[in-house]
């Protein structure tokens, strides 16, 4: 083995030695699932783990109480690398996406790398970033806006899956709420006096369905009616729908957004209602991984004997705030 391979083996051995310690934290987070922006127990478990291994930890960065930044500064020149951890859960399901593993893997990798950096006097700054609200709220996008990632040369995250892959593909995504406002009236006695907001919502859905044919492959639009009225014998004066719009490219997604907006405006005109739009959560952009880093991941997977497949469009695609 050359020096690099010896160091990789040392890292692998250290990770195995500390496996039980890391598993306890992961199991604790799994057993205490917390929704976006409410991950107080998970945050504290990860922060205490990192502090116990000498990281300087700051809680509540970027105006998010459940975020954190853990730093090891070698005091020597070098790159700044961030390992990103997630730890929020899904409503009702819990940790169905394995965020207990993501948060713990980031902290665990940071602890192991810090020990190796100290032993071999490797320069640079190592950060572990606690990024809340990936499932709803896009905490990383908020952190980008607050400058948390400025000065970072590389940011990495591991996501569990049923197959190992060194690269990833994701949709850019935006969620919009459309509120249609009409005029109430009795649906039997004098419906002509009203303007039906629910009709506006229904017509918008039909218009969006007509547009699907014209969107590029690997684009998605899916929506639900969140408010449709309170009584069947009255003309609904307010109705709401939420649409999620996705595409492989952020710029094309925004073209789709313009088309969806036209569907809403046209539906409002046709039903003599009015429509208002509100963006829900942060926009998430498509992931564009650095190909050199991807190749390093491949080599490291080969080194430890990890079997993997290459990512492609047939495997199912989701969205994540990592792309921001």
Show the residue positions of the predicted features.
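Generic structural signal for well-ordered, non-membrane alpha-helical segments
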Residues: 4, 8-11, 15-22, 39, ...
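Active-site oxyanion-binding pockets that recognize sulfate/phosphate
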Residues: 8, 12, 32, 36, ...
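Residue-level "edge-of-site" marker
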Residues: 62-63, 160, 281, 314
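Histidine/acidic-residue-rich, glycine-tolerant segments that coordinate divalent metal ions
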Residues: 66-71, 88-96, 100-101, 107-109, ...
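Metal-dependent amide/peptide-bond hydrolase catalytic core
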Residues: 202-324
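Acidic/His- and Gly-rich active-site-bordering loop/insert found
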Residues: 2-124
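Residue-level signal for inorganic ion chemistry
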Residues: 29, 143, 243
